[in-house]
Design a protein with these regions (language model features):
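N-terminal targeting sequences that direct proteins away from the cytosol to non-cytosolic compartments
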Residues: 2-118, 195, 214-238
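Conserved polar/disulfide-associated segments of primarily extracytoplasmic proteins
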Residues: 43, 93-211
Length: 238
């Protein structure tokens, strides 16, 4: 059911990708980039479309005392522990989630889980590019750059990057990092420009599950180490 709703919500994006395929066939890379920019914005308007994670993988140390202070919550298919004062919402991937629709002044954490191989089921064609699990899909997506689009695969992942990336505040000051944490690994796009912090966390576990945590930290109470402590509590629930 979740996968069916996900497909429905991304219909517009798929149509854009089909149009991109037409442009690829009859035009060169420069025209292709211009066409994509007309649909999702350019690097000046949306800098993260031309950003990629820092090369070095970050290995955080978790503050055990802080982790112990977190409050545990159970949701369908996943559990997580978070600080007091945050509203939690479990979501599906859909366009409204990733825009500035949630422009209220409440500290909130949006949660998402996708089962192993979910992205392969949605987009089986990517397996021809050697992408065979959720982590490989997200890795390719995070490294996608509009100014390096040369073919339909490049275009697909840039478009998907625009969909998967929520509001992270001032993108001109945002950063992208990759990390490894015990049996978890992934990427964080974040901005820590006061008065508010934003953290877009894309996490995979050893079983192949994909988790997304979007943290809107009103009042800038969290730092990166706090966010890693929250990530470390992610678990699937059968």
């Amino acid at each position: 059911m979740a996968t069916n709703r996900l497909v429905k919500n991304l219909t517009g994006i798929i149509l854009l990708i089909l149009a991109v395929a037409f442009v690829v066939k009859f035009a060169g890379p420069n025209i292709l980039r211009q066409y994509i920019s007309s649909g999702i914005g350019n690097c000046k308007i949306t800098p993260i479309l031309c950003m990629q994670p820092e090369e070095k993988s970050f290995t955080p140390l978790i503050n055990a005392e802080y982790k112990e202070s977190l409050i545990p919550y159970n949701f369908p298919k996943m559990s997580v522990s978070v600080p007091k004062g945050f509203t939690l919402i479990q979501e599906l991937i859909k366009k409204p989630y990733y825009k500035k629709r949630h422009a209220n002044n409440k500290a909130v954490i949006y949660l998402l889980i996708q089962e192993p191989g979910a992205f392969m089921k949605l987009y089986p064609e990517v397996q021809k590019q050697g992408i065979n699990d959720n982590y490989a899909f997200i890795n390719r997506l995070m490294h996608a750059r509009l100014n390096q689009v040369n073919n339909i695969t490049d275009a697909f992942f840039v478009v998907m990057k625009s969909v998967f990336t929520p509001d992270v505040g001032n993108q001109s000051t945002s950063k992208m990092i990759k990390f490894e944490l015990a049996d978890l690994k992934g990427f964080i796009n974040y901005s820590m420009a006061k008065p508010d912090n934003y953290f877009d966390c894309n996490v995979s576990d050893q079983a192949g599950n994909f988790y997304k945590l979007y943290i809107k930290d009103i009042g800038a109470r969290l730092d990166l180490n706090n966010v890693f402590a929250i990530i470390s509590t992610l678990k699937p629930v059968n």
